[in-house]
């Protein structure tokens, strides 16, 4: 923990397999946060044996943070705060999380969400790429939650999300009054059960210049897209939906209502997941697999 908080700018931490705890000050076996004050890279050496980091990150001065090929485990955290919490206003180049599993636990462990930006941070890029993210209930915050920040690009690519934000919004992006040119992209993601209590997948109020929603599978949710007139209608392409009763039903008139738009090109098919309860979203329906939707590793039925 002290090595990360005192890292030199641009330092790379290459981790061998094993467990690395960001121990709480109380020395009671729980884990806490580390403040990242300088730009760093944290990566696992072996793709087949990822190191486990127990704890969470507070971005407090770092202008570039890259996390690759690790497991981020919040099960021992002594607070319910987000996996990534931006603490300092100002310019930042990027937060990129790739090839990583992020897991909480029921009743704790990142219970407030995955990422929180409640300062006037102007960020070039926030990206989650090829990540499995699960068991983050979102009690006290939305899953991705930006209240005051701004990102030129916000990307979720080739990710699997399950057991997340059952009663909160999937992506919340308020107007931080910094800029309005964000391109928000959700591509090749498998999203199961998110925002299931009639919440929103896109609670976006900052006037994004473009929202791209492509090549995704969304299943088993009562969510709507948005009830906000400021949410720009996405560019939809090649998406599959199953057991999403409200998502593609427009309930909207005169700039208000319960659901502002739908995916006009939606395909409604059961992907026949192998074992969703255990996090195995292998597609058993050949017709769905051939569409190459969702996270790429689940295309087994093709």
Please report, for each region that a protein language model flagged, where it lies by residue.
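Short glycine/acidic-rich loop motifs that flank beta-strands on beta-rich extracellular proteins
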Residues: 24-25, 52-58, 75-83, 105-115, ...
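Active-site-proximal beta-strand/loop segments in catalytic clefts of secreted hydrolases
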Residues: 16-18, 45, 276
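Extracellular beta-strand-rich solenoid/capping regions of secreted or surface-exposed proteins
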Residues: 9, 22-41, 50-94, 117-120
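Extracellular beta-strand solenoid repeats
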Residues: 14, 21, 35, 41-43, ...
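Acidic, glycine- and Ser/Thr-rich low-complexity intrinsically disordered tracts
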Residues: 228-302
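Right-handed parallel beta-helix
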Residues: 39, 63-74, 92-106, 122-139, ...
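Acidic Gly/Asp/Thr-rich repetitive segments characteristic of extracellular carbohydrate-active
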Residues: 1-27, 286-295, 299
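Non-transmembrane interaction and regulatory regions of membrane-associated proteins
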Residues: 174-175, 182
């Amino acid at each position: 923990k002290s090595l990360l908080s005192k890292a030199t700018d641009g330092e790379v931490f290459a981790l061998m397999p094993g467990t690395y705890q960001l121990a709480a000050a109380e020395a009671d076996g729980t884990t806490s946060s580390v403040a990242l004050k300088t730009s760093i890279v944290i990566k696992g050496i072996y793709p087949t044996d990822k190191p486990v980091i127990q704890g969470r990150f507070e971005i407090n001065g770092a202008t570039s943070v890259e996390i690759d090929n690790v497991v981020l485990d919040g099960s021992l955290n002594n607070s319910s705060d987000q996996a990534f919490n931006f603490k300092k206003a100002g310019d930042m180049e990027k937060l990129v999380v790739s090839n990583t599993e992020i897991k909480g636990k029921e009743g704790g462990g990142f219970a407030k969400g995955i990422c929180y930006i409640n300062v006037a941070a102007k960020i070039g890029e926030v990206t989650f790429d090829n990540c499995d993210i699960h068991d983050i209930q979102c009690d006290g915050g939305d899953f991705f939650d930006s209240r005051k920040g701004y990102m030129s690009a916000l990307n979720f690519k080739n990710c699997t999300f399950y057991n997340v934000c059952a009663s909160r919004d999937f992506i919340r992006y308020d107007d931080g009054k910094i800029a309005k040119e964000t391109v928000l992209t959700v591509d090749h993601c498998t999203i199961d059960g998110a925002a299931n209590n009639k919440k929103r997948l896109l609670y976006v109020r900052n006037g994004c210049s473009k929202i791209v929603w492509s090549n995704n599978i969304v299943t088993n949710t009562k969510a709507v897209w948005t009830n906000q007139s400021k949410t720009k209608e996405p560019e939809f392409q090649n998406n599959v939906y199953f057991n999403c009763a409200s998502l593609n039903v427009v309930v909207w008139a005169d700039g208000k209502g319960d659901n502002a738009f739908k995916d006009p090109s939606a395909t409604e098919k059961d992907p026949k997941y192998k074992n969703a309860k255990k996090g195995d979203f292998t597609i058993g329906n050949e017709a769905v697999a051939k569409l190459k939707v969702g996270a790429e590793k689940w295309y087994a039925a093709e």
